[in-house]
Regions:
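Acidic/histidine metal-binding catalytic segments
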Residues: 8-26, 39-46
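An active-site-proximal "capping" alpha-helix that borders the catalytic cofactor pocket
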Residues: 1-7
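Divalent metal-dependent phosphate-bond-processing catalytic cores, especially two-metal-ion Mg2+/Mn2+ enzymes
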Residues: 29-30, 34-173
Length: 173
């Protein structure tokens, strides 16, 4: 696998090869395994953050219809489930298995911001502007919009805080 991507991969030490392979293999796991070493977790987090930033770009550039199979109007007419809202209030990644409405699918992607643990990644997300574009939402029902504003505020506060506490981003921090 890696030898196809990284030239001279065979010249990297066996330990470094193992770390890189684990990082690539686990970077998209909802929760990182407890069995990873600190070094392996660090590499996973680097790849995860790059991937999350790319997901924001892909959603904006590809459009909602392509990504979600429904249009903006359908998403903005739907509800926000308590399970997805709770992820925002806990400042954690949303469990994709708990998405139940069109809005949940979009908000679960916005919640990826809680996986941006490094200041550099949060700064880059703000500089790129894709996440802010994803968060420009006005839900059709006032009670849903009110709930969304609280979620959006939580995400914006997270992105602009200087220091992250241990455990931010979920159980895999």
């Amino acid at each position: 696998m890696a030898e196809d991507i990284i030239p001279n991969f065979d010249r990297i030490s066996a330990e470094d090869q193992r770390v890189l392979e684990k990082a690539v293999y686990h970077h998209s796991d909802y929760r990182l395994p407890d069995t990873l070493t600190e070094r392996e977790k660090t590499f996973c987090k680097i790849i995860r953050e790059a991937d999350q930033l790319d997901i924001f770009r892909t959603i904006v550039e590809s459009g909602w219809e392509t990504i979600y199979g429904c249009g903006r109007e359908e998403i903005l007419a739907s509800e926000i489930s308590d399970a997805i809202a709770e992820a925002f209030f806990r400042r954690q990644l949303a469990d994709y298995a708990k998405r139940s409405t069109p809005a949940d699918y979009h908000l679960a992607h916005i919640a990826l911001c809680f996986g941006l643990e490094s200041k550099a990644a949060r700064k880059r997300a703000l500089e790129q502007g894709y996440l802010q574009q994803m968060m420009e939402l006005t839900f059709l029902r006032p009670e849903v919009q009110e709930k969304y504003i609280r979620l959006k505020t939580e995400a914006e506060n997270y992105l602009t805080e200087e220091e992250k506490t241990e455990g931010a981003g979920g159980a895999d921090s």
